[in-house]
């Protein structure tokens, strides 16, 4: 379980030769530039130009129809934009996440294997017309580009706002209207949810992952504005000194923060680890523990994406308004 927690925390911090086919969009890498994008603000027809994080200026002649993702954190965005990919890594893992279960039940994706070891042969068999990944796929960029044109996104700066990744991907695939509609839908949900949580304005909250007996992953305020921001999020209050960015803290540091409520990432084996903690005097003295205010949220609610944010918001509200 410790390995799972480390992977998920890394995700958040990160969150940081063409295959011929008659109906494929024609996409050419023209040159390199330091610009971020040449897309207009509103949805535009094709052809369109996009400049990715490597500085490649890519002209997309037609709207892509067979998209392959080589970074699994981006997959939920494709579902949100009503454009499920044909293939992605770690589909088996994602199928266990509560937020993605309904999407994966309705859409069959070819599993490309591990996020860190993409099955290139299987990807070739898929015959994508566009591959989307992140800068963490740069090591296999040359291999990927022999299969289909590649767009690499720098998701690290985008991960600080759940709206950014949908908007950025929408520029690539021509789904700006879908992105804005889904964003508006979630923004309205957050506004309604914030009103329901007004009785908790004087209480403090922490969002954690139990790494081991001595430390916790802590999900920072800047990384989770949907939970903490008073204008664009639920407006939950963190304890004084709560980290701005996602990282790790000791049990002793958690005791200093002493939140009234703790939302804990639910992963396999968490119940047993909590049982082991019951004998720890520091843990038992926490305000949240004494008050019975330690709650579980499925791990899929901590990945910062638009679907994860919606899932997390709904679960926080459901938990606190039972």
Residue ranges of predicted features:
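A short, structured surface patch at a secondary-structure boundary
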Residues: 72-122
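Structured C-terminal subdomain patch of bacterial secreted/periplasmic proteins
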Residues: 257-322
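Extracytoplasmic substrate-binding proteins
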Residues: 140, 146-212, 302, 306-322
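Proline-aspartate-enriched helix->loop->beta-strand connector
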Residues: 120, 125-133, 149, 254, ...
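Bacterial Sec-exported substrate-binding components of ABC uptake systems
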Residues: 3-9, 19-73, 178-206, 268, ...
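Short helix-initiation/N-cap motifs at beta->coil->alpha
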Residues: 53-55, 112-119, 242-251
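A local structural motif
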Residues: 57-63, 104-111, 232-243
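Alpha-helical, coiled-coil/dimerization segments enriched in small aliphatic residues
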Residues: 216-246
């Amino acid at each position: 379980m410790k390995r799972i927690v480390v992977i998920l925390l890394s995700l958040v911090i990160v969150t940081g030769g063409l295959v011929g086919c008659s109906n494929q969009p024609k996409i050419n890498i023209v040159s390199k530039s330091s610009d971020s994008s040449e897309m207009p603000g509103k949805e535009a027809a094709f052809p369109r130009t996009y400049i990715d994080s490597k500085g490649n200026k890519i002209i997309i002649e037609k709207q892509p129809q067979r998209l392959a993702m080589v970074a699994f954190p981006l997959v939920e965005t494709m579902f949100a934009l009503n454009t499920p990919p044909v293939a992605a890594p770690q589909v088996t893992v994602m199928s266990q996440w509560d937020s993605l279960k309904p999407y994966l039940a309705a859409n069959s994706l070819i599993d490309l294997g591990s996020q860190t070891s993409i099955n290139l042969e299987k990807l070739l068999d898929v015959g994508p017309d566009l591959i989307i990944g992140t800068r963490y796929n740069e090591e296999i960029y040359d291999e990927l580009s022999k299969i289909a044109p590649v767009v690499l996104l720098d998701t690290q700066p985008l991960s600080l706002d759940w709206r950014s990744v949908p908007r950025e991907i929408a520029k690539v695939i021509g789904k700006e209207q879908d992105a804005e509609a889904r964003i508006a839908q979630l923004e309205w949900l957050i506004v309604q949810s914030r009103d329901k949580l007004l009785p908790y304005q004087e209480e403090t909250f922490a969002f954690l992952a139990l790494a081991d007996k001595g430390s916790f992953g802590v999900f920072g305020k800047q990384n989770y504005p949907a939970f903490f921001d008073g204008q664009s999020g639920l407006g939950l209050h963190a304890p004084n000194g709560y980290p701005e960015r996602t990282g790790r803290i000791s049990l002793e540091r958690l005791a200093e923060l002493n939140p009234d409520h703790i939302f804990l990432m639910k992963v396999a084996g968490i119940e047993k680890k909590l049982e082991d903690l019951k004998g720890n005097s520091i843990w038992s003295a926490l305000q949240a523990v004494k008050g019975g205010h330690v709650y579980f949220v499925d791990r899929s609610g901590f990945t910062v994406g638009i679907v994860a944010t919606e899932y997390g918001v709904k679960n926080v509200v459901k938990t606190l308004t039972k």
